[in-house]
């Protein structure tokens, strides 16, 4: 993977390239970023950058190499070339010097699973679900209700692989995705992290710092990865996914900096959220209890992910309305959304809109924890009615 294929994160990309070109990259690196930040993609791009043949040294200059050994001069590119044999192998996840570790499951009693047992599934997952999370990965290998784990057997396999000589590049690279699944068994890797064989690069890719072993945290060079800007996701949708601009402008703010969520919204949502929201608001403020019950009955069947997407859409429009009221300037959103946001301002004062946002956030939290959707949306309907009941009754057309 090329750095240029990853949306946003310009500062992180420049930092990683600078760490390599200035010989300041630790042999143990921790990329820490929330779901959908592109942390795994940055790790893949870094590994490809390190093995890229166009970044190989030329003549001796007496300086230390990436791992403290004598090196030769080289002009480092700002990205891997993408065309040399090493880059092509790295892009296909088949480079013999780049190893992958990730949570696995036991498929049969007595098995001692290793990541290499699932390497074909891993390649398919990275290609088809590029910003998937651990749940997506485990479901793709048939986990269902089974817990994922990085096993003692896997740790031993990592140590064995990285003690072998490199095949082609001069480096041996491990990308371990979701080290949160290591547990205390991760202490088996401490000696490898502290005293790695020459030419070894360990890249840990994590989401939750609180679930990492303190002994691993203290022995790795930390690179924090922020959530993406809405404009970066919008540009990625338009330029890489060929999404029409209006649709990209709607999806980007709803994803809240999460590329996985943007991917889900793009591929899994065929609902007309604007029409559903219009029907709900008219039921609340104009049409009365019978219409409210009908709406709740219909939309409680949407499914948890779509219900969360719908609430996120409503929050997005409310936030835009509040921004228009407070700043006097509309955010960059689709024309139909701008019109809806202005109608919301006529429906309620900004304080009321902000109160509705709080209720929607709370409802989304409870949906995530499997609340009964019919009860939840009926209660939410009543709460929203009481928040705006002092306003004149109008229709949202």
Model regions and ranges:
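Conserved Walker B catalytic segment
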Residues: 171-173, 177-201, 208
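Clamp-loader machinery-focused feature within the broader ASCE/P-loop NTPase space
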Residues: 2-5, 9-184
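Charged, glycine-rich active-site and insertion segments that engage polyanionic ligands
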Residues: 1-78, 85-86, 198-201, 207-397
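Conserved adenine-binding aromatic site and its adjacent loop/helix in ATP-hydrolyzing domains
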Residues: 160, 191, 218
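Short, structurally constrained coil/turn elements
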Residues: 92-94, 196, 216
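Secondary-structure boundary motif
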Residues: 164-167, 195, 239
